[in-house]
Amino acid sequence: MNIPKIVKSSSADLDKVKSVLTLGFSSDALLRWVFPDASSYLKCFDIWMEEFSKIAFENNIVYSEENFFGSSLWHPPGVEFDNSVLGPTFEYIPADRVEVVIKFFEEFEKYHPEDAWYLPFIAVDPSQ
C-alpha cells in the first residue's frame, strides 16, 4: 500500500481543490438531499466551495494529496463564517426542504465551539 503524500495547497490550486471536493461530495446523502438536481448541486456547491475555501486559503490551511486525489479545507479557531453568503443558493433548494435546512444550520451553530478547529470539507475523488 502506498502512503499518499499530503501537501499544502496554495490559492493557485483553488480550481483543483474545488474540483476534487465537488466530486467527493457528489453522492453525499445530505448535500444531495438539499440539492437533488445535478445542475443545482454543481452550481450551488461551487458557491459553497468558493466561500468556505476563502478562510482556509487566507490562513494557509488547505491540504491535498499531491495529485489532488483528495483535499481538505480547515478553519482555525475563532474565525467567523458568514452564512449569509450562502443565501443565494437557497433558491435552488426544494421549497419543502428550506425550513429543515435552515433549522439544520441553526442547530449546527449551537454545537460549534468557537475555540475549536473546524473541518468544513474533506473528500477524495471517488475514482481513487
Outline where the language-model segments fall.
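Active-site rim helix/loop that mediates acceptor-substrate recognition in acyltransferases
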Residues: 38-61, 109
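Conserved beta-hairpin
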Residues: 54-73, 123-126
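A structural preference for long, well-packed, hydrophobic secondary-structure segments
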Residues: 16, 126-128
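Helix-loop element at the rim of GNAT/NAT acetyltransferase active sites that forms part
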Residues: 19-39, 52, 96
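Conserved acyl-donor/pantetheine-binding loop and adjacent beta-alpha core of acyl/acetyltransferases
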Residues: 71-126
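A short beta-loop-alpha structural element at the N-terminal edge
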Residues: 5-19, 23, 27
